[in-house]
């Protein structure tokens, strides 16, 4: 038997497996080409795309909206309940309580107000003595940061006083402590000046003693009480 050449093509029939229209690959060096899409398959794909069109998408959208509605209502329920509670509390509030709350708000507004600056003898701004308290502290000036954030200062103050009623008393306590501290410093300074006129050599030791006592009274003792260490210290 003679051998066939390597590039000879042998036609094969696809009658056994039903592939009559699919061209067969060559035996030699050829590649099998993909079969073109049949008209029946193209028609089935178009029908499937038509079935999966806007109707299922609309149905899914309605189902998603129905699922999201109870969750949104559950999230908004606490906010609405809090608003109703505040409105009911405002309705039950007596005129005396309303007047007291307005007085507290006015007092806190006065304490938190910005000081009017003056020019000192050295050309530096100096706060007036009438604007004492927390208003002299620059990091508590809230008006400019709140205005940048778009928050009304009076609304913020009212919300703070309604939710934290202990704040006015705490601010007044800090103001009173600051006033006593300033008065003690001024009295001690006057005493030092008088003592220096009589005995200049002893003033340095008195200054050191006063500094240590002031640090202990204003810093160390409150820190010890805050940490709860005063229970372990023998006061005797």
Curated annotation (Swiss-Prot):
Subcellular location as annotated: Nucleus
GO cellular component: nucleoplasm; nucleus
Highest taxon of source: Eukaryota
Paired cysteines (S-S): none
GO molecular-function terms, A-Z: SMAD binding; transcription corepressor activity
Principal location listed in the UniProt entry: nucleus
Skewed-composition ranges (Basic and acidic residues): 18-34
Keyword Transcription: yes
Residue runs in coiled coils: 170-190
Biased amino acid composition, Low complexity: 38-71
InterPro entries: EID (IPR033258)
Signal peptide segment: none
Residues bearing the modification Omega-N-methylarginine: 59, 75
Keyword entries, A-Z: Coiled coil, Developmental protein, Differentiation, Methylation, Myogenesis, Nucleus, Repressor, Transcription, Transcription regulation
Tissue expression summary: Most abundantly expressed in placenta. Highly expressed in liver, brain, heart, skeletal muscle, and kidney.
GO process terms (BP): cell differentiation; muscle organ development; negative regulation of DNA-templated transcription; negative regulation of SMAD protein signal transduction; negative regulation of transcription by RNA polymerase II; negative regulation of transforming growth factor beta receptor signaling pathway; regulation of cell population proliferation; transforming growth factor beta receptor complex assembly
Residues covered by region (Disordered): 1-71, 112-131
Function summary: Interacts with EP300 and acts as a repressor of MYOD-dependent transcription and muscle differentiation. Inhibits EP300 histone acetyltransferase activity. Acts as a repressor of TGFB/SMAD transcriptional responses. May act as a repressor of the TGFB/SMAD3-dependent signaling by selectively blocking formation of TGFB-induced SMAD3-SMAD4 complex.
Record text about domains: The N-terminal portion of EID2 is required for nuclear localization.
Subunit: Heterodimer with EID2B. Interacts with the C-terminus of EP300. Interacts with HDAC1 and HDAC2. Interacts with SMAD2, SMAD4 and with the MH2 domain of SMAD3.
Stated name of the protein: EP300-interacting inhibitor of differentiation 2
Species: Homo sapiens (Human)
């Amino acid at each position: 038997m003679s051998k066939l050449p390597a590039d000879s093509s042998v036609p094969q029939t696809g009658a056994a497996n039903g592939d009559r229209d699919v061209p067969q690959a060559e035996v030699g060096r050829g590649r099998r080409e993909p079969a073109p899409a049949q008209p029946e398959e193209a028609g089935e794909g178009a029908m499937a795309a038509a079935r999966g069109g806007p109707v299922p998408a609309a149905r899914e959208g309605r189902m998603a909206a129905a699922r999201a509605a109870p969750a949104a209502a559950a999230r908004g329920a606490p906010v609405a309940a809090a608003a109703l509670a505040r409105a009911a509390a405002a309705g039950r509030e007596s005129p005396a309580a309303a007047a007291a709350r307005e007085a507290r708000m006015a007092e806190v507004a006065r304490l938190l107000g910005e000081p009017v600056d003056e020019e000192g003898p050295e050309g530096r701004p100096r706060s007036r003595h009438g604007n004492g308290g927390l208003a002299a502290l620059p990091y508590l000036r809230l008006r400019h940061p709140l205005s940048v954030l778009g928050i009304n200062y009076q609304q913020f103050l009212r919300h703070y006083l309604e939710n934290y009623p202990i704040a006015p008393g705490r601010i007044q306590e800090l103001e009173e402590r600051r006033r006593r501290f300033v008065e003690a410093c001024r009295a001690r300074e006057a005493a030092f000046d008088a003592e220096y006129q009589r005995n200049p050599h002893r003033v340095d030791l008195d200054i050191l003693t006063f500094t240590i006592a002031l640090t202990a009274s204003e810093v160390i003792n409150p820190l010890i009480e805050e940490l709860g260490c005063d229970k372990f210290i023998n006061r005797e």
